[in-house]
Amino acid sequence: MDPFTEKLLERTRARRENLQRKMAERPTAAPRSMTHAKRARQPLSEASNQQPLSGGEEKSCTKPSPSKKRCSDNTEVEVSNLENKQPVESTSAKSCSPSPVSPQVQPQAADTISDSVAVPASLLGMRRGLNSRLEATAASSVKTRMQKLAEQRRRWDNDDMTDDIPESSLFSPMPSEEKAASPPRPLLSNASATPVGRRGRLANLAATICSWEDDVNHSFAKQNSVQEQPGTACLSKFSSASGASARINSSSVKQEATFCSQRDGDASLNKALSSSADDASLVNASISSSVKATSPVKSTTSITDAKSCEGQNPELLPKTPISPLKTGVSKPIVKSTLSQTVPSKGELSREICLQSQSKDKSTTPGGTGIKPFLERFGERCQEHSKESPARSTPHRTPIITPNTKAIQERLFKQDTSSSTTHLAQQLKQERQKELACLRGRFDKGNIWSAEKGGNSKSKQLETKQETHCQSTPLKKHQGVSKTQSLPVTEKVTENQIPAKNSSTEPKGFTECEMTKSSPLKITLFLEEDKSLKVTSDPKVEQKIEVIREIEMSVDDDDINSSKVINDLFSDVLEEGELDMEKSQEEMDQALAESSEEQEDALNISSMSLLAPLAQTVGVVSPESLVSTPRLELKDTSRSDESPKPGKFQRTRVPRAESGDSLGSEDRDLLYSIDAYRSQRFKETERPSIKQVIVRKEDVTSKLDEKNNAFPCQVNIKQKMQELNNEINMQQTVIYQASQALNCCVDEEHGKGSLEEAEAERLLLIATGKRTLLIDELNKLKNEGPQRKNKASPQSEFMPSKGSVTLSEIRLPLKADFVCSTVQKPDAANYYYLIILKAGAENMVATPLASTSNSLNGDALTFTTTFTLQDVSNDFEINIEVYSLVQKKDPSGLDKKKKTSKSKAITPKRLLTSITTKSNIHSSVMASPGGLSAVRTSNFALVGSYTLSLSSVGNTKFVLDKVPFLSSLEGHIYLKIKCQVNSSVEERGFLTIFEDVSGFGAWHRRWCVLSGNCISYWTYPDDEKRKNPIGRINLANCTSRQIEPANREFCARRNTFELITVRPQREDDRETLVSQCRDTLCVTKNWLSADTKEERDLWMQKLNQVLVDIRLWQPDACYKPIGKP
């Protein structure tokens, strides 16, 4: 344990003993009521809302008074005060214990209202008693102020009393810490036989205060935020006290918010009174909205009174927002008192918050993880309650008595002589104002300010500050768990400044801070302090457990709290939207979208708080709010500094967002390193474009994949099915062509005509294709899909695929035949047909060419262009030449005339003749066309040739199988072009060895492998702007395979050797890199890569290019030299 903690523990023990001793010496009920009155004086002196503050101050002062005396000036003292709070917590625990009773009272229909009213009534009565006592002990001005405040309250009650009274009564116990304690007070007051008349008065006042809910929703939210901030960062003691009270009850958060805002106006009580009415409505309104949205969440998060109230009585949550309003009025009084004694009050408030939290947690059903710690406080509280049972009504009065006196004296002294302190605080306040203005300068156009008129300035600043404060508390909360004492000090200073400064802007700032720090944050901090107080050894463990418990409870309670928040928030939205409903919804949606990323990473506390709110507004689902704590903290800081309102603020005060806030995402200002880092982290989260470095790419795998893709493993069954379908189609074509030919019985019916020749052509093509398909099918059945992979290349590199194109086909005829056909054109018709076959799937037939129309000189020309795609280098294309002779019978016409004269042709005779002749022409033998084929084609094969890669470069090919008496000359002319589908490319720096004036030098070059050449430049940018310095043509390479250079000759690492040959020139001479042999100049190229991997990659790609060149363009390159 560090020495600082040990000091705190020692001081805590001493204070505890002192407090217990003083408590034993104190009177019971009467002095406690006096204490309450004194506390009420303090808030009255500072704030206009005295009555609510009395209750809240009683709670706050209960713990802090002893601790404040000791630790009013020290932040450490506050931590110790938290420990000292245990005795105070006993009282506050009592108050919390009554809060469970308050749920019991609430079930009673009339009693709920009366009790809730009784709470303010008891507070009012106590305040009145306190007023009289204050007159005795303090300046009469305080009493006068309290009376004025009470009168003003009555006026508000008379003006604002509405149907909200029952709600207020219901809310009162839950929302404010004072109210949380107040419901127990009514019970206690009942137990103590509190007069009915007094109850009635208090009920009326409570109803009036509750009726303010509609007007005070936004201000109430602000108060909530104020409490949250002190709870989180413990920056201001007021806020810490209010935060603690907020822990006890979400209403207490409201009270603290009001308290903080009023504390700012403490310097001028009258002004504060007048402004408190307006602020009460505005601040309470914001508080109510924030508490509505926040307080349930806070109660859930902190697992304090709000949570316990939810578990005990679900009505308490709705009540919470209203009671915070009431308590918010009373809190200003406490704020005033605390502002006078800022350090002591901050400590007191913080201690109270901690105690109340512990009490609430002990009573809270959801605080299971914190239970052992809470049980300890509960036991102590029970002991104190046994010692002073009369405390029930005044609760904290006895504890406050000794400390309260000192605090009151300090407050009066501060009122009388606040020159030095006041000036210092004013300076601080001015600085805070400047910061608030800077942080919220984009929110100047808030709808809040426009609506509230006179308070527009204060409201704008408040909203601005709320926006910033929401972020700052989160940031502060980050460091709260680590250094609790420091946040406490910050809070105290901040709260002191606003307390002394009567301007509403500091109020808004403090409120904003409290609001921002969300109850969960406060709870975490307070619980940590409590754990420190309770035990020194298990302190760290308890901290962790408490935090975990809180998080779990927040998640569990989000459902219940979200429901309540939705109900409460609906009213706020109705009030806030009015004419701006549509614009606000659009703004909220736009803001939600723009800030969704930022708000996703809110603190755990803010997550729990915002989840229900997000559900209400429909911004983001609670699940989306979950994120790691680091991200939450970072994003929180960024969102805090951004001018646009956060989710929390937006939901509470939807109207407070200006139109400019829509584009606020673009103007996010990064005030801190955290914000910058979070932004940078967000950027890294986005999917970045991965830059592929070619030199590190494994080309072998790609090449293998590419090569294996062509002999793809097609499903055998599917392939066989396709072949069968194609065979059936060809069978149909064969049958139809045969039937057509059978009809050509004479010249009148197409015999010897072009149609008959076309039918013969179709029959020939279909028959040949069917035969090829059957052969392919049989191969598939016998050999399977591995047939194509049998001829695997011997070398390591697979040659690339290519395309083959055949064009300009010419078929020369014999000169004698050409002359005879010209002389006797009517003797016969000669038709020629060329079929190109490259497997069963690639079969193309040229159109019919006859000597009458296609003869060009002594050769027949065919315009067909045949192209094969994606063929390997071992392709084979079969060329087959067919001819058909249609001889004309000169006596045919005479015979036809005779028959027509002798016998008329009737349909019956025609049918008989066709049948007879078709039977004559039909073939009895099995036809290649299939079983259903009637006949075979009359085309005869007169020549054939097989083309391969070796045929490339030739245009004249000798036909095989040419008959001796054929009309063909025996040759065929065609153009064959092969194109390699090689896309091997590489770019990178290589160091090339060159001869410079007889000396070897290595020069770094930017080399590009494209096509068959390696081109190199000095810089990469020169590739597109300049001609290359030099080229190495791989077609001239004589190296059988490119390999690493021999280290005996080249000592440079990662070097490979490339030997090229070119014809010798006259000016060639031998150098270090080139030698002349016979008529050739041999150049040895050494290229060095930066790494071994790069060298291997270059070698692989160069070898691939060489393979493709040598296989596809054998005549275009030199034959390799060396061992095969």
Curated annotation (Swiss-Prot):
Any one of the GO CC terms: cytosol
GO biological process entries: actomyosin contractile ring assembly; hematopoietic progenitor cell differentiation; mitotic cytokinesis; podocyte cell migration; positive regulation of bleb assembly; regulation of exit from mitosis; septin ring assembly; septin ring organization
Disease: Focal segmental glomerulosclerosis 8: A renal pathology defined by the presence of segmental sclerosis in glomeruli and resulting in proteinuria, reduced glomerular filtration rate and progressive decline in renal function. Renal insufficiency often progresses to end-stage renal disease, a highly morbid state requiring either dialysis therapy or kidney transplantation.
One matching Pfam family: Anillin_N
Domain PH: 983-1107
Sequence ranges of Polar residues compositional bias: 77-96, 294-305
Protein modification: Phosphorylated during mitosis. Ubiquitinated, and this requires FZR1/CDH1.
Organism this protein belongs to: Homo sapiens (Human)
Keyword list, A-Z: Acetylation, Actin-binding, Cell cycle, Cell division, Cell projection, Coiled coil, Cytoplasm, Cytoskeleton, Disease variant, Isopeptide bond, Mitosis, Nucleus, Phosphoprotein, Ubl conjugation
Residues recorded as bearing Phosphoserine in the entry: 54, 72, 97, 102, 172, 182, 225, 252, 261, 323, 339, 417, 419, 449, 485, 518, 553, 561, 637, 642, 658, 661, 664, 678, 688, 792, 927
Region (Required for ubiquitination): 1-45
Biological function: Required for cytokinesis. Essential for the structural integrity of the cleavage furrow and for completion of cleavage furrow ingression. Plays a role in bleb assembly during metaphase and anaphase of mitosis. May play a significant role in podocyte cell migration.
Gene from which the chain derives: ANLN
PROSITE patterns in the record: PH_DOMAIN
Region Interaction with F-actin: start-end pairs: 231-676
Annotated spans, Nuclear localization: 1-230
Cross-link (Glycyl lysine isopeptide (Lys-Gly) (interchain with G-Cter in SUMO1)): K254
Region spans: Disordered: 1-113, 136-196, 294-328, 380-399, 579-600, 625-664
PANTHER family: ANILLIN (PTHR21538:SF27), ANILLIN/RHOTEKIN RTKN (PTHR21538)
Comp. bias intervals (Basic and acidic residues): 1-25, 148-158, 380-389, 631-644, 654-664
Annotated positions of the N6-acetyllysine modification: K371
Region described as Interaction with CD2AP: spans on this chain: 1-155
Tissue: Ubiquitously expressed. Present at highest levels in the brain, at high levels in the placenta and testis, at intermediate levels in the intestine, ovary, skeletal muscle and thymus and at lower levels in heart, kidney, liver, lung, pancreas, prostate and spleen. In the kidney, it is widely expressed in tubules, but sparsely expressed in the glomerulus. Expression is significantly increased in renal biopsy specimens from idiopathic FSGS. Overexpressed in many tumor types including breast, colorectal, endometrial, hepatic, kidney, lung, ovarian and pancreatic tumors.
Ranges of compositional bias, category Low complexity: 97-108
Subcellular location: Nucleus; Cytoplasm, Cytoskeleton; Cytoplasm, Cell cortex; Cell projection, Bleb
Protein name stated in the entry: Anillin
